[in-house]
Amino acid sequence: MMNKESFGACLLLTLPEDVFAVISRFLSPSDICNLILCGKSLCALVDSEKTWLVQCEEVKVLPLIELVQWRIGISSYKALCRFLVEVVKPLLGIWVQENPELGNVVYVMPGFLSVVGCRIIPQKVAPLWIQEGQVKWSPVFEIICGFDGSKGFFLHGRDKQGSFLYPGFVMDIEKSCNVLLLEVEPRSEKSSCNEIEREVGDPFGDLDFSDRMNLLDIVTKHVSLRVDEPLTGNLFPTRSKYDEAMMLERRNMLLKMLKFGGNWKHINLEEDEQLCYNHIEIDIKKLLENLGDDIDNMEDIEDQIEVTPRKKSFRRFLRSGIKHILGKFSSSKINSPSSSETRRSNRQSFLSSGNTFCLSLKASCTLMSSYEGWPIMSADNFSLHKLPMKKPLDHDVYAGLWGGTFGWPPGKDIEDESLLLLMLTYGESEEGSERILFGTKILSYFAEHPNGSSMFVVNIDTPSLEPFPFDTDGRDFEHSYTGEGIADGYGFRYPGSKPGSLFVSSNDLLAFVWQGTEDVITLQRINLGEILKKSLGSCVSPLLPTKNFTYTKRSYSNVFAKSSTYSSSSE
């Protein structure tokens, strides 16, 4: 008599492939993989391209036309689904850092078989900036999908010689990640391909900040790869066939760089092999074993270390960095013995936890508090923090990202205005009886109030009786609410405020007006992904690699706009 498992498998096998693909919409990727346990005869059904295309659609991060476009460069829709679920979906969104004060906004979006982190630069914009897509941005990092769905990481950066890419590993990406960390990762010799085995040792985050900074500087300097066009070209595909071919060529170049390092131009990429990252590590441990107690004798052993031929300047850089990490620290005279010993112990433990060291990107979920929609973050980590985004309720009609400028009416000013990006979120009053709308500033062109300040706080349940104080410019206002707008004060916890009103126009514009003044912010909802895909904006060269990921110093100037554009840097 046929057992239940075999009977169930036979029923599934009798279904047409198209019918099973429809049924699979109600299953998760893990459910489909588990069907193999019902019988080996189901393998062909489970591996069906139609079934996994449906699963890719159900992830809901790419439209169907782009899924088909991505399939060209990957072995199967099953491999593509793996990348979408493990990498793309958890990372998409807006990531921020508290420094510099003008704002540090990194928008993570799909590229071409990749995920790209783009920094929106503090800037002044033309009156019709949103229609024309005139936004300055800069690349921060990319995660590339291999032919089998595996993943590789590139940090973007530059130095005096031009633009560089810094390859590395992608560590664990948690599904509900809210912190993105740039780290140096120990690697064991027995690790193969893109797998890393951690030995017992203190994690990178336990090291002193200066040690972490110097390790990152050493490793990025070692693994850096000079790049020119087309590697610094467009990161986002269009529907043009020519563009598609260029994107595929660029992605193949990146895969070769991950696999072969500096020799990538002279070696063919085998598509049937898994990505193996053997040329993006630095053997710090072997170096240190040869150093002994005399750090100053590094010149005698430089030739024993396999490093990229980057002249003696890099050797001097490496030597000074190692001296700082393991040398005779003058800071021990200042620090207490217990603090100094703890620091040295953590350092030694970390450096003994692997045979080689590489650059890594890690996305983890940590317990993180927030203040009026702004995450409370540490300033001494090389990290980006995801803006907490609750799924808006049906009546949370204004929640989301809005952009705009000071002034009214929009689009009529002759001079460029400072771009403001505000994240609008809902909350409750302290009494819990009224709904509050917070307009949290995440980007501006001036630092009068720090990043994370609430530009306005509006009581959604209380209509405003104030008339709109300007010419309506032919627009009708459907709603208005009472609130307060930021004024004099200091910090984002203790700002001053003045009463004001939020006006909602019939064409989806918001205008917050400070009562008794002519100050007004005009906002419209924006889609950064669509703006960047238009390729009409200006791509600004990145900063030095570690600063490009996280700018750890407080600054009131526009540090991101000091670089020239790619076109000028490649001349």
From Swiss-Prot:
Residues 9-55 form the F-box domain. GO terms for cellular component: secretory vesicle. SUPFAM superfamilies: F-box domain. This is Putative F-box protein At5g39460. It comes from Arabidopsis thaliana (Mouse-ear cress).
